[in-house]
Amino acid sequence: MQTDSLSPSPNPVSPVPLNNPTSAPRYGTVIPNRIFVGGIDFKTNESDLRKFFSQYGSVKEVKIVNDRAGVSKGYGFVTFETQEDAQKILQEAEKLNYKDKKLNIGPAIRKQQVGIPRSSIMPAAGTMYLTTSTGYPYTYHNGVAYFHTPEVTSVPPPWPSRSVCSSPVMVAQPIYQQPAYHYQATTQYLPGQWQWSVPQPSASSAPFLYLQPSEVIYQPVEIAQDGGCVPPPLSLMETSVPEPYSDHGVQATYHQVYAPSAITMPAPVMQPEPIKTVWSIHY
């Protein structure tokens, strides 16, 4: 234990090397007439401590620091009437034993409110890694316990991140097929009968289109609040293919026109487009 001679004036002093972890603060202002006493047994009370130090001077006040539960932290402060009595105790600190236990005695120092900048303090200094009784790890640093939560693997959502309204509007999206058929209607004839035929349309002419209601597939689409839509997965549906037919008269090709709306779907409008058939008579 190394001790320094102290002057009565309350001037800042250099750090006092103390081996006990319950030692006095290392930086601050020395409090006159007061000493720090560490290594106190938890069974020792203030009256016992006063009686012991009264042998070396006139004791004014004795204070043992306790925790919130009232249990002694193992250190306290003794204030003497004069600085000379406190100085004498500091000089004889190595010789003082209480109940066969060596006391850790040093000057009483009041901590400075504005001390060393935080940037100059190493974060790892004074950090303790502990574990609770239930097995949760935490770090204790500067009087604050920091609990570490385990990492949770995030599961990506099955849909895009954009929000979808709680009551989506269903819009029917028609998917239809328009197969084209090229045909030539020919009839057998006997001698003496007329022969007639329907000419085959050329490649440049518009093909005949057949569209039946069974070929229309409706897929619901959800409309989001932000104006975007989330398309459902594409599903393939088997559709019936109409059989081509021929007529000897005038045929009309029907185109089914759709006017999709975000609210309702009107009935399909049938617009007939007459196509003329060219007749040829051979003798």
From Swiss-Prot:
Testis specific. Not expressed in early embryos, primordial germ cells and spermatogonial cells. First expressed in the cytoplasm of spermatocytes and then persists through meiosis. It is found in: Cytoplasm. Disulfide bonds: none annotated. It comes from the Eukaryota. InterPro entries: DAZ_dom, Nucleotide-bd_a/b_plait_sf, RBD_domain_sf, RRM_dom. CDD domains: RRM_BOULE. GO terms for biological process: 3'-UTR-mediated mRNA stabilization; cell differentiation; meiotic cell cycle; positive regulation of translational initiation; spermatogenesis. Keywords: Cytoplasm, Developmental protein, Differentiation, RNA-binding, Spermatogenesis, Translation regulation. Gene3D superfamilies: 3.30.70.330. Residues 160-184 form the DAZ domain. Residues 1-25 are annotated as: Disordered. Residues 33-110 form the RRM domain. SUPFAM superfamilies: RNA-binding domain, RBD (SSF54928). One of its GO terms (molecular function) is identical protein binding. One of its GO terms (cellular component) is cytoplasm. Interacts with DAZ1 and DAZL. Probable RNA-binding protein, which may be required during spermatogenesis. May act by binding to the 3'-UTR of mRNAs and regulating their translation. Belongs to the RRM DAZ family. This is Protein boule-like. It comes from Homo sapiens (Human).
